Each structure stands twice: as C-alpha cells, then as structure tokens.
Design a protein with these regions (language model features):
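An N-terminal-biased, well-structured beta-alpha scaffold segment characteristic
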Residues: 1-96, 204, 224
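Conserved N-terminal Rossmann-fold NAD(P)-binding element of oxidoreductases
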Residues: 9, 152-155
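N-terminal Rossmann-fold cofactor-binding loop
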Residues: 10, 177-181, 241
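Phosphate-binding beta-alpha-beta segment of Rossmann-like dinucleotide-binding domains, i.e.
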Residues: 91, 99-150, 162-166, 170, ...
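Hydrophobic/small residue at the entry helix of a nucleotide-binding pocket
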Residues: 159
Length: 323
C-alpha cells in the first residue's frame, strides 16, 4: 500500500523530517520560503496532506480549487488564523494544530520581552554597540520595576496561564485577566487573579499587559487607539499572540506620545514585513517571531503535527482537530 503524500511547506528540524519520511511520501519545500496562492492551490490538488505554517496564507482565494486531493491540513503551530476554516470545511479538509507543546517557551518569550522593555535592555545594548556609554550614573537609562507590579493578561488559555504562573509565583505580580469566557474560580484562585469585563478596564488597572488571545477577524485591532488612551500611565504592552491583534499605527503613536511607556513585540501584522513606523520607536523591543524557537519545542511541534496526520490516515479522529 502506498504512503499518503505529505507536503511540508517549510523546513522542519531534521529529526522530524526523518520521522515524517518513515510514515509518508514526503515532499519538502527546499527553498524554505512562503508559498504563493498559486503554489498552495497546486499543492491542494497534488498532495493528500499538507503541513502549513503561519507564513502560509490559506485564504478563500487559495482554496479556490477543483479536484482537491488534500484531505488534511496538519498545521505546524497552535494558531491557525492564517487558514480560512469555512473554506477548508467546504472542501471537506480536516484541520489540526499543535497546542500544549509551545506554551512554556512562548510564555518565556513574553517574560523576556516584558523584562527587556521594562529595563530598556534594547536601548542599553544599542548604546554599548555604538560606543556611546559614558559610565554608570544614578539617572542613566532608568526603567520600570517588574517585581510586585500588576500584570494584565488578555486571553487566558494555556499560554496565558503559563505567563500568569511566571508573573505571580516568579515576580510576585498581581494578576488581572480578560477573557470572553468566564474563567473558573479554581483557576482564578490558583493565581489570585481578578477577571475584568472589558479590555479597557484591564488596561486601566494594569502596569503590564501581555496578549495571548487568538488572531483572526474577531480580534483584529483588539488593542487600538481608543482603548490605549484609557491605559494606566506607564503601561508596557507585550504581544506574542498574533500581529493583527494590535493596531500598529495606534501603538506607534502611543509610544511616541508617551501614552504608554514601552512595548515588546514578537509578532507583526503582515510579517515578515515590519511597519516602518515601528522601526522608529526607541521604546519598542522587537523579536522575529521567536515564541516557540527552541530545539525541543520546534521538534515537539513537528512530532505533534505528524501524530495528527497519522491518526487521520488510520481512520481515527486527530487529537488536535479544530475543523
């Protein structure tokens, strides 16, 4: 019996690619660059399974295909806002993701950005590399204290709770949360957290706000000029969720005009292109989407995607089916 044909749209860690070849007839994207819509349409007609990433835009145009061969999109990553789910369903394509395995590493990056933005680490490094440091002095590059402050978390799933754990138990922070669903008293009690009914209210009562909600149309520009104007003085905003969650023009304006103190971004709207107005903000720390970028996590993500794909072709329901 022939193996199902699997197309992997970006290069995976070697160990995972080798494991994939044992179970599937694998085609790799050797150029390791994002696919065009035409490339994706051709792939949907050619392969039994495709493993896309956040860099692959699977919008309705990409799904405008006849004689589809693809039966499953085993997404490499937990977020799947780059996949138009209704279009996939219309073509009878199963969609899976890779939750759980990247929660800790993404939470670590959120805390990294929080500390860097608060303590002006990016500015300090740039000063040193430019040979502009003139020595220690009491008023040099004063930042914000993290320990004991109030941390607001928007989106309280696995990653949001991992950040709460680090903030509360590691830095003695008070935890505020916003979630569209009611969080159980047991989970709130674990972090001594308070749930807020609106983003605006949370922004006004937090020193730091970290975003951990899904992307997609429902959360596009969830952080915008209107609610940033209601933020507590000195707020520091962190985004490791999805770029579209933040109105980047509004963020740049808030940074320039001291509406908020600083920000840290690991994700961007339209990445890998970065909005030029963000580049000009000295009080903004930026990383190139490194949330899950550890050897262990990237391998676990690949193995999880493969497990979903194997289950599907065995006739079982994949454990991480989202559509």
């Amino acid at each position: 019996m022939s193996k199902p044909k699997l197309f992997i749209t970006r290069r995976w860690p070697k160990a995972v690619e080798e494991a994939a070849k044992e179970e599937f007839d694998v085609t790799l994207n050797d150029k390791d660059i994002p696919l065009s819509a035409e490339d994706m349409r051709n792939a949907l007609k050619t392969y039994d399974a495709i493993s896309p990433t956040v860099t692959d835009i699977l919008n309705p145009k990409a799904f405008d295909v006849e004689n589809v061969s693809c039966k499953i999109l085993c997404n490499y990553g937990v977020g799947y806002s780059h996949i138009d789910i209704p279009s996939a369903k219309n073509l009878g394509i199963c969609v899976t993701n890779t939750p759980d395995v990247l929660s800790d590493c993404t939470a670590d990056i959120a805390m990294t950005l929080m500390l860097m933005a608060a303590r002006r680490a990016g500015e300090g490094e740039r000063e040193l590399r430019a040979d502009k440091w003139h020595g220690w002095r009491p008023t040099h590059m004063i930042g914000a204290k993290v320990t004991g402050k109030t941390l607001g978390i928007i989106g309280f799933g696995r990653i949001g709770q991992a950040v709460a754990s680090r903030g509360h138990f590691g830095f003695g922070m008070k935890i505020n949360i916003f979630s569209r669903s009611q969080v159980s008293a047991e989970i709130l009690g674990k972090y001594n957290a308070e749930q807020f009914s609106s983003v605006e209210a949370l922004l006004g009562e937090s020193d730091f706000v970290s975003l951990h909600c899904p992307g997609g149309a429902s959360n596009r520009h969830l952080i915008n000029a209107s609610n940033l104007a209601k933020a507590r003085s000195g707020l520091i905003l962190i985004n490791t969720a999805r770029g579209e969650v933040v109105d980047e023009t509004a963020l740049a304006d808030a940074l320039e005009n001291n509406v908020i103190k600083a920000a840290g971004l690991d994700v961007f709207d339209g990445e890998p292109k970065i909005n030029p107005i963000l580049m000009a903000a000295p009080n903004l720390v930026m990383l190139p989407h490194l949330g899950s970028a550890t050897k262990e996590t990237r391998e676990e993500m690949g193995f999880r995607a493969l497990e979903n794909c194997k289950a599907f072709f065995k006739g079982d329901t994949p454990m991480d089916k989202v559509a």
